[in-house]
Amino acid sequence: MAMALALRRLSSSADKPLQRLFNGGHLYSMSSLPSEAVYEKERPGVTWPKQLNAPLEVVDPEIADIIELEKARQWKGLELIPSENFTSLSVMQAVGSVMTNKYSEGYPGARYYGGNEYIDMAETLCQKRALEAFRLDPAKWGVNVQPLSGSPANFHVYTALLKAHDRIMALDLPHGGHLSHGYQTDTKKISAVSIFFETMPYRLNESTGYIDYDQLEKSATLFRPKLIVAGASAYARLYDYARIRKVCDKQKAIMLADMAHISGLVAAGVIPSPFDYADVVTTTTHKSLRGPRGAMIFFRKGLKEVNKQGKEVFYDYEDKINQAVFPGLQGGPHNHTITGLAVALKQATTAEYKAYQEQVMSNSAKFAETLVKSGYELVSGGTENHLVLVNLKNKGIDGSKVEKVLEAVHIAANKNTVPGDVSAMVPGGIRMGTPALTSRGFVEEDFAKVAYFFDLAVKLAVKIKGEAKGTKLKDFVTAMESSAIQSEISKLRHDVEEYAKQFPTIGFEKETMKYKN
């Protein structure tokens, strides 16, 4: 009861002044580390405070060195994995702050630990900013910012709103869906979602690469799902949310929109929003949103309808979802992540952020156009969001082999299934996206160059395949080790690195890097 009362107080507490939290300074600063004066009262034999306040390079040079290597990789490479991004320095400062020290099971105003005054302020501010970022009325929408990542967030929703073995429909994984929506093969339930719930996929029309909404509606009529997921991890087109809403209404099913990949684009208003149609919306917070690694669950609240008897019916999602997150499936929230998310959500309402997301879209369109002109087949023929899915079958090579060559030349992309694949172990495609490199300042002409590098890598992969003594990936990797091939890889890697190094790093300064060569 106390938890429910506290949750109802969130909207009013969100309006309280927050000056005490910031106190005119920074949430986190290396210069705020204690000086030697702090240790004037140290007790005999109590030596650990000095160690606890020593910098990373002193305490653990091995980990410090690994971090420096990762900085160099990010600086010298081309990051094309669409689920990745470079989060801001300010977000990383918040995530690396003292907010990591506090346990706070429960919700603002209803914690199971004391000392959470400022944790409550940060979480309440994060919730307020989440609603503002997506232009939502707090009387009609609520949000939980405690989920640790996207897959748990989806499972929280299923646990809250469904009974065991209720039915879920979602986009098939080989057609661009996600494991957290439930996936099983003919012989095995791969995702835990498919163990605890009954799942049925809808698919793309393989001739067009678009979702087959007609077949989805027919399947839903037969399957009678309790929940339908509108969301994907490798679908380059916009969802027809209105069409899925219509199917949900017909089946009296809950509509869950998983906007994990596209939430940054939605926040900036450069693509249609699912909030006009969905009952519940989930998202991760790192991908196009460019925050820390976490997740959010948005849910409708307030008046749902007036029934035939003239009685008002209200949404009952809020308490169910909050209780599924805690205490149902999680304990203490990650307060440092929530604090960093609050910073990212503030950034998401700026003019710079909107301009960034517009550039993400322009870059994706240019990338797709250049790839098509270079003879590549794209699933659905193009893109309407931040990613492209390349079908490599007309090149006579699979995604696993191309991914190996791309990685060797410092281009990060991922192999991906495409319609018509018979094995997830030998996927026919490569998935690539524009958010990360756009964060570094890449524009259209740069993505034309990236497409050129990709084309060279694919041609090299085809050559290596021709020289391999077998058809398996291990045979391909062995063929990559020849001196002639290594020479070609080295040249392409050099060209990629020299191009990438021209652009700004995000979250750290080039001048402070240990490995610059």
Swiss-Prot record:
Record text on subunit structure and interactions: Homotetramer.
GO annotation, biological process: glycine biosynthetic process from serine; tetrahydrofolate interconversion
Cofactor: pyridoxal 5'-phosphate
Keywords (A to Z) from UniProt: Mitochondrion, One-carbon metabolism, Pyridoxal phosphate, Transferase, Transit peptide
One MF term in the entry's GO annotations: pyridoxal phosphate binding
Listed name of the protein: Serine hydroxymethyltransferase 1, mitochondrial
Pathway given in the UniProt record: One-carbon metabolism; tetrahydrofolate interconversion
Upper lineage: Eukaryota, Viridiplantae, Streptophyta, Embryophyta, Tracheophyta
HAMAP family tied to this protein: SHMT (MF_00051)
Main localisation: mitochondrion
Places the protein is found: Mitochondrion
EC number: 2.1.2.1
Entry's family note: Belongs to the SHMT family.
UniProt catalytic activity: (6R)-5,10-methylene-5,6,7,8-tetrahydrofolate + glycine + H2O = (6S)-5,6,7,8-tetrahydrofolate + L-serine
Record flagged with keyword RNA-binding: no
Organelle targeting peptide span: 1-31
Matching InterPro entries: PyrdxlP-dep_Trfase (IPR015424), PyrdxlP-dep_Trfase_major (IPR015421), PyrdxlP-dep_Trfase_small (IPR015422), Ser_HO-MeTrfase (IPR001085), Ser_HO-MeTrfase-like (IPR049943), Ser_HO-MeTrfase_PLP_BS (IPR019798), SHMT-like_dom (IPR039429)
The UniProt record lists the keyword Magnesium: no
Record-listed N6-(pyridoxal phosphate)lysine modification sites: K287
Role this protein plays: Catalyzes the interconversion of serine and glycine.
GO cellular component: mitochondrion
